[in-house]
Amino acid sequence: VATVDCSDYPKPACTLEYMPLCGSDNKTYGNRCNFCNAVVDSNGTLTLSHFGKC
């Protein structure tokens, strides 16, 4: 199972670095920061489906 450590999030701003991750909501997030901020916003219900685009 793919996992991402989001313990140091949320962050106020994310870089434009592009390393896509696919969330359990079937949405592609541009990088770990964007994904982790969304995880925090979802109260932990969002999980990582896999690395790369959905």
Curated annotation (Swiss-Prot):
Pfam families on file: Kazal_1 (PF00050)
GO cellular component: extracellular region
Domain Kazal-like: 4-54
Principal location listed in the UniProt entry: secreted
UniProt key word Transferase: no
Site description Reactive bond 3, residues in chain: L16, E17
Superkingdom of source: Eukaryota
Coiled-coil region: none
GO MF term set: serine-type endopeptidase inhibitor activity
Name of this chain's protein: Ovomucoid
Source organism of this protein record: Dendrocygna viduata (White-faced whistling-duck)
